[in-house]
Regions:
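Short, charged low-complexity linear motifs
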Residues: 8, 79-80, 118
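CheY-like receiver
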Residues: 113-132
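Receiver (REC) domain switch/output surface
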Residues: 106-110
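Short acidic-hydrophobic, aromatic-tinged amphipathic segments that line or gate anion-handling sites
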Residues: 95-103
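Amphipathic alpha-helical interaction surfaces in cytosolic regulatory modules
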Residues: 17-94
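Short, flexible coil/linker elements and helix-boundary hinge sites characteristic
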Residues: 37, 111-112
Length: 132
């Protein structure tokens, strides 16, 4: 069985999110989420304060990815920012990692304790032939 790994895109969240920086960020990100099942890691290392604008930006990214059956994970999130995400009630929507590398690697872990992905019909036929 051949399993192709889709690319993981890492995008750096700006230090301060304003209406203008949010529009630019989402415009830049659009080319990466317009794929089937986009896999995004948002690098939060520059985020000093997890305010409402930043949380809104994260949620917009998640919404765009989920429209295409993708996922967004957060990397390099500071402890105070994690606390703010929990307080705002959105921490359960994201997998949060201490580093960008850990967040990226989490996409590469096979099955990660969940049900394996469905096999393509051709692969299912091959599996059935091997059993018979």
């Amino acid at each position: 069985m051949i399993i192709k790994m889709r690319a993981v895109t890492v995008h750096e969240v700006p230090e301060k999110v304003t209406a203008a920086t949010e529009r630019k960020f989402l415009r830049d990100l659009q080319q990466y989420v317009e794929t089937e099942r986009p896999r995004l890691v948002l690098d939060c290392s520059k985020v000093r304060q997890m305010d409402n604008n930043t949380i809104h930006l994260l949620l917009c990214c998640l919404e765009e990815a989920m429209k295409r059956n993708g996922d967004v994970k957060l990397g390099a999130v500071r402890p105070d920012a994690k606390a703010t995400l929990q307080f705002a009630g959105v921490s359960r929507l994201f997998e949060v990692y201490n580093t960008v590398a850990e967040a990226t690697q989490s996409f590469r872990q096979r099955f990660g304790g969940i049900a394996p992905p469905l096999l393509e019909p051709v692969e299912q036929e091959r599996e059935a032939e091997n059993v018979a």
